Design a protein with these regions (language model features):
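Extended recognition patches within non-cytosolic domains
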Residues: 69-77, 86, 226-267, 498-500
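Glycan-binding loop/region signatures in secreted carbohydrate-active enzymes
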Residues: 46-47, 60-82, 264-267, 276-277, ...
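Extracellular glycan-interaction surfaces
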Residues: 71-96, 117-127, 142-205, 229
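Flexible glycan-contacting loops in extracellular carbohydrate-active proteins
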Residues: 198-223, 248-253
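Single conserved hydrophobic/aromatic residue that forms the stacking wall/gate
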Residues: 1-14
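Chitinase-like catalytic core of GlcNAc-active glycosidases
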Residues: 13-85, 201, 265-400, 490-493, ...
Length: 514
């Protein structure tokens, strides 16, 4: 814990002094929603504990980021300030190579079945077999995008499968090309033409999920500018300089602009850039708060089942916390379901605490159907955020919220370590929608917990239900409230904000005479 974090608006429990009357107001930041301005500085500033969900584990314990930092290493690649009407470009000599690292077109969450690659290209000499990009496993092709044997022919190889396309003239001047791939179908966009050209040839439905380097420009002779890789099918996105203010662009995995002559391989879109922007936004907010790394998904069950991987995972998390100045870490692994998985989860928590030491804030998010970790693991955590909502509709009402809290306490989780979760979204049982969508759609009441949106009736928590839950937390001396999440609430400057209600109740109960 950080004992210095005390202030008039601060609601932080001191685990060494549980008599302090204060409440944790915890919520999650999803980087893509922050980037498209769905999460304001004011809403983040209202929280005392912020979790930036950005990472996931591999089975071997290594940590990957959802939006990897792909700063490229250049070999025999030169930077040109201007060339043939474009500024800030890179030149390849045929013996050049740009290595974008091992973070692209594979994931700890599974194989890619769609992606896009786009770039501006100036071909000095057509070279049969020159690579625009490739990923190799030794001598075996994972994926490769190459020039063909004849001018204006290109080929895409995935494993041993090959598809080809014939393009308009690319041999003179600058051209934009955008490759898209989705479940075996590949298409190419050229220049300003909105009609894609289809590749001919059968391709597999996904890219082999092998972690190897993403290499650009091997054997290529010419220039590149504004190169990107996206997890979506957005072949035309790179025609104009990319700005990260819309959903499609938020899914761009790497963007090399080549504008910085001192660092031409700089990746202009990464989890770290988002982190820096979050910190900048928080600078103007009053009070103190923690900003922590959130880790979710990935191959967490495999990692937790292996003692060596658990140790490596804990060590890597510690390094990330120290290198990037996080205030701690949160586990959001959903969820252990049997005795073996509970044992592994508990062992991972204990290993993480041992590695981090006492004073790094460490929490885990569990659920009423999955919370029975060991007493030693409970003791190792600063708090447990308890997801008292979804996916079943029956989890949303106030009465169930009370029952779920009581069940956790009866199991042995102390109230001063239990941060009760509330939803900022609604559910039909199979569909979900954001509370802010209800408000923007015309939600008028403050005390009804159902709303019909786009023909479907959703159960959610109204302002009055959130207020009732917040008061219960305060009066029953739970540690605080966790909300999912800031992107799905209406902005806190709006009187219909659910976060605003929580903040008001916490401030009153922390200072009842004021």
């Amino acid at each position: 814990i950080m004992p210095s974090l005390v202030g008039s608006e601060m609601c932080i429990r001191d685990r060494d002094n549980p008599t302090v009357k204060s409440f944790i107001n915890c919520s999650y930041i999803r980087g893509d929603f922050f980037e498209i301005n769905r999460i304001s500085a004011a809403s983040m500033g209202a929280c005392t504990d912020l979790i930036y969900l950005a990472a996931r584990p591999y089975a071997n314990g290594e940590v990957a980021f959802e939006l990897p930092l792909n700063d490229a290493t250049m070999t025999n690649v030169s930077h040109a300030g201007t060339f043939q009407g474009r500024n800030g470009v890179v030149k390849f000599e045929g013996t050049s190579l740009m290595n974008g690292g091992d973070g692209l077109l594979h994931s700890a969450d599974g194989a890619f079945n769609k992606f896009s690659f786009g770039t501006y290209i100036y071909i000095s000499e057509w070279v049969d077999g020159a690579f625009l990009f490739k990923k190799m496993d030794g001598n075996s092709t994972i994926i490769a995008f190459q020039m063909g044997a004849t001018a204006n022919s290109l080929k895409l190889s995935i494993g041993s499968s090959v598809a080809t396309v014939t393009t308009p003239d690319l041999a003179t001047g600058w051209h934009y090309i955008g490759l898209t791939y989705e479940q075996g179908t590949a298409k190419l966009y050229v220049d300003t033409n909105n009609t894609a050209i289809s590749f001919v040839g059968a391709l597999p439905n996904e890219v082999p999920n092998t972690r190897t380097d993403f290499l650009i420009g091997d054997k290529f002779k010419g220039y590149l500018d504004e190169t990107f890789v996206s997890s979506l099918v957005v072949g035309t996105s790179g025609r104009n300089p990319i700005t990260f203010d819309n959903w499609n662009n938020s899914k761009i995995l790497a963007y090399w602009k080549y504008d910085d002559a001192t660092k031409p391989g700089k990746d202009s879109h990464s989890w770290l850039g988002r982190l820096n922007n979050i910190r900048t936004a928080l600078q103007g907010q009053q009070g103190d708060r923690r900003l922590r790394l959130g880790i979710a998904g990935g191959e967490w069950k495999k990692m937790m089942a292996d003692a060596t991987a658990r140790t490596r995972f804990a060590s890597e998390v510690k390094k990330i916390i120290e290198q990037y100045d996080f205030d701690g870490v949160d586990f959001d692994f959903e969820w252990p379901t049997n005795a073996s998985e509970y044992n592994n989860y508990s062992a991972t928590v204990i290993q993480m605490r041992s590695t981090l030491g006492k004073y790094v804030y460490f929490t885990a998010s569990l659920h009423p159907v999955s919370f029975k970790i060991s007493p030693e693991a409970i003791d190792a955590l600063d708090f447990i955020s308890y997801q008292c909502y979804g996916p079943a509709v029956m989890r949303f009402p106030y009465e169930q919220f009370v029952k779920d809290g009581e069940a956790a306490v009866a199991y042995g989780i102390p109230k001063n370590k239990l941060v009760m979760g509330v939803p900022f979204y609604g559910s039909t049982g199979s569909l979900i929608a954001a509370y802010c969508d209800f408000v923007n759609d015309g939600l008028a009441t403050t005390n009804e917990d159902t709303y019909t949106y786009k023909g479907n009736t959703y159960t959610f928590n109204s302002i009055e239900t959130i207020r009732k839950k917040a008061r219960y937390v305060c009066e029953e001396d739970y540690a605080g409230i966790m909300s999912w999440d800031l992107a799905t609430d209406i902005d806190i400057t709006n009187n219909k904000s659910l976060l605003k209600v929580i903040k008001e109740e916490f401030e009153y109960y922390a200072n009842p005479t004021e």
